[in-house]
């Protein structure tokens, strides 16, 4: 299968004089439909790498390739926004759902942002809510949902625009183990059906084993885990 996402020689340094390396020369290619788990101890740079991958943070050096479109630290904010909206999906440990919106409105939002009509956005949102088993709760507020249900809303929102890749930063970290596997299975099933790649940062080693392959950040370096 073709490569839909790649990091090439990505480095990130912090400090006044860039004296603190967080990531050094990270390279990875992710194919269409592939699930790649990213592991590493707390503070190793997993979230930083995913933020760079999602064009939410700028690398000190290196390039990101999304659908063969090159993106560097010189890429304009306008172009980054376009790439995020049309090619990327995001899921976080803390769902970042809009509390004042209903379940349906939260899931519709990415479609509205890219210019879909409300009627089409609503139709697509209801279809994907059915896939994550929340179609009966579309009118509820986020505060009325359980933690697992909120993450299912976050998954639906991340997938509604059929991105090339979903970047998931500890998406099940706040859930109990059974709920975590249930939520991940929903994500995995839909992504497989639509051939969507997933780059998943997790502390859950059992969850990581369900990926196609595992990579690890250790001492600022990214390497494959056999």
Swiss-Prot record:
Enzyme Commission number, as recorded: 7.6.2.-
GO MF, one example: ATP hydrolysis activity
Key words, A-Z: ATP-binding, Cell inner membrane, Cell membrane, Membrane, Nucleotide-binding, Translocase, Transport
Top-level taxon of origin: Bacteria
Membrane-related topology note: Peripheral membrane protein
PANTHER family, per database record: ALPHA-D-RIBOSE 1-METHYLPHOSPHONATE 5-TRIPHOSPHATE SYNTHASE SUBUNIT PHNL (PTHR42798:SF7), LIPOPROTEIN-RELEASING SYSTEM ATP-BINDING PROTEIN LOLD (PTHR42798)
Classification via PROSITE patterns: ABC_TRANSPORTER_1, ABC_TRANSPORTER_2, LOLD
Assembly with partners or alone: The complex is composed of two ATP-binding proteins (LolD) and two transmembrane proteins (LolC and LolE).
UniProt source species: Ehrlichia canis (strain Jake)
Record bears the keyword RNA-binding: no
InterPro entries per record: AAA+_ATPase, ABC_transporter-like_ATP-bd, ABC_transporter-like_CS, MacB-like_ATP-bd, P-loop_NTPase
Protein name: Lipoprotein-releasing system ATP-binding protein LolD
Main EC class the enzyme belongs to: translocase
Residues engaged in binding ATP: 40-47
UniProt similarity note: Belongs to the ABC transporter superfamily. Lipoprotein translocase (TC 3.A.1.125) family.
Alphabetized Pfam families for the sequence: ABC_tran
Gene symbol of the encoding locus: lolD
Function: Part of the ABC transporter complex LolCDE involved in the translocation of mature outer membrane-directed lipoproteins, from the inner membrane to the periplasmic chaperone, LolA. Responsible for the formation of the LolA-lipoprotein complex in an ATP-dependent manner.
A single GO cellular-component term on record: plasma membrane
Location of this chain's protein in the cell: Cell inner membrane
Domain ABC transporter: 5-225
């Amino acid at each position: 299968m073709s490569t839909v996402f790649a990091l090439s020689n990505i480095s990130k340094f912090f400090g006044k004089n860039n004296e603190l390396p967080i990531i050094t020369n990270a390279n990875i290619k992710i194919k269409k439909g592939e699930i790649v788990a990213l592991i590493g101890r707390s503070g190793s740079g997993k979230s930083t790498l995913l933020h760079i991958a999602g064009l939410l943070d700028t690398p000190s050096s290196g390039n990101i390739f999304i659908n063969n479109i090159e993106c560097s630290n010189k890429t304009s904010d306008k172009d980054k926004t376009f790439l995020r909206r049309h090619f990327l999906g995001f899921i976080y440990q803390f769902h970042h759902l809009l509390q004042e919106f209903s379940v349906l409105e939260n899931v519709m939002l990415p479609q509205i942002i890219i210019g879909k009509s409300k009627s089409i956005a609503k139709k697509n949102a209801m279809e994907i809510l059915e896939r994550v088993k929340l179609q009966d709760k579309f009118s509820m507020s986020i505060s009325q949902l359980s933690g697992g249900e909120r993450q299912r809303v976050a998954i639906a929102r991340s997938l509604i625009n059929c991105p090339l890749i979903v970047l998931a930063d500890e998406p099940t970290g706040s859930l109990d183990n059974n709920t975590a596997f249930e939520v991940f299975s929903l994500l995995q099933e839909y992504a497989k059906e639509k051939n969507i790649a997933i780059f998943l940062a997790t502390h859950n080693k059992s969850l990581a084993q369900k990926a196609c392959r595992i990579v690890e950040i250790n001492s600022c370096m990214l390497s494959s885990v056999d």
